[in-house]
Amino acid sequence: MSIVELESRIAALAPEPRAAAERIFAVSTTTGTLVAPAEMRPWIEKQFGSVDAVTSQRIVRVTDRVTLEGALFNDLRAKRPMSVPEKSGAEVAETIRSTENDPFCSVATGTPADDFGRIRGALGVTASNVAKYDGYHGVLVFNTHDPLAPMDAAAIADHLATARKWAEAAVLRAPAAPYYFLMWNCLWRAGGSIVHGHMQMTTTGGMHYPKVERLRRAALAYAAEHRRDYFDDLWLVHEAIGLGMTVAGARVFATLTPVKERELVVLGAPGADEGAIAAGISLALGALRSVGVVAHDLALYRSPLAADGADWERFPVLARLVDRGDPGNRTCDIGSMELYAASVIASDPFVVARSLHQPVGR
């Protein structure tokens, strides 16, 4: 099964998941063609395997009608020429090793504390971010310097619990800012300015950050129109077409509308806290690592830590993880299409989903 077969796969589903797929997704396939001059043929064959591979290209477009997130899939994009230094994996390992004894390795003297102090977990301790982008903006510094060290469900759970305690302390200080957001930018390619393993946390007021609030409103609109839960239907579709699996109650799937390469989504049950998806996050992280991903972004969406008068009843805790590419690659993975139109994706979600069944090094 591949993404180019998506339309026929949906058409063959049982009535309930097929109806959900048709409610949520708009799927279309188009063909791109070109005429290659004879002078280019040797280069094309070397780069793409054959001239036929580029002469006629199938592009699959998937749009989530509810959230208006969308992706354009063409696996040929993965073979396009880019400036990638050799041995970038070895260079990453050397960079991690050479940055030991950085300020995060001495948290007490190398980082500031928040005005409520530090929160300590078994595997990490919090600090206050020096250059903030919200009133409370903290860092969860891992005890282990290497951000690529294996991380099982227990380790994920410990980090999530420590970060949550930080957020609760922040909300006690600033009750008007109950919206908690957690992120993990792993390595410089993914936006991490410090190599040492760390997550970041913020709390904000007024409403949740726009992308979280937009998702909440979209799900409510879907429920009002169809009398169905958007997140349950989203899972129903992905599971039915073979893109998802469950682990310890968490629903993990390779999304049909990834923001960028190899995006995995982890859904909890409504009312559950983030600890309930620790095993799912560990599975997703291990799946990415099993296919060589080292630079990734992770975001945690959840309801506010105090009632705000809005309807969050059916909003589940969820995590999104995405591959940001080879740290040694000088070509940026984000361009004008991703910023202003739709994501252009080279990785097939069905291939990504297979990695969920054979992750290593979690």
Which role does the model predict for each range below?
Residues 1-362:
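HIT superfamily nucleotide-processing domains
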